[in-house]
């Protein structure tokens, strides 16, 4: 399983309420409909460690694909890369994109 993790902050001129409205509707649908995506989520980071420190990144998005081939086909598709670059340049200022292979996983239904 391949996981894309994007940690980011918005540019000061980006209205957070408007961003969240878009991010939780149109953009969430776009993320979940990317070819091969089996899971995606979006979070607001409110706590960090050590205790009483502020999170470096306000937002985090993850998306998962079953294998590297499907990830690369979707993520590195030229039109998607253009859209991604434009979106990042327009809205984000401090960001990190991490691509990792999941080596261990545990899910518990409570």
Question: What name fits each language-model region?
Answer:
Residues 1-110:
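Macromolecular interaction modules
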């Amino acid at each position: 399983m391949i996981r894309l993790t994007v940690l980011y902050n918005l540019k000061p001129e980006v209205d957070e309420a408007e961003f969240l409205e878009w991010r939780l509707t149109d953009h969430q649908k776009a993320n979940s409909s990317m070819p091969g995506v089996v899971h995606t989520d979006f979070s607001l980071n409110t706590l960090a460690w050590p205790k009483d420190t502020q999170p470096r990144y306000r937002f985090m998005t993850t998306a998962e694909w079953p294998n590297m081939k499907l990830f690369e086909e979707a993520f590195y598709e030229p039109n998607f890369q253009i859209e991604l670059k434009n979106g990042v340049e327009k809205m984000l200022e401090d960001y990190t994109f991490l691509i990792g292979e999941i080596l261990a996983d545990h899910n518990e239904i409570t």
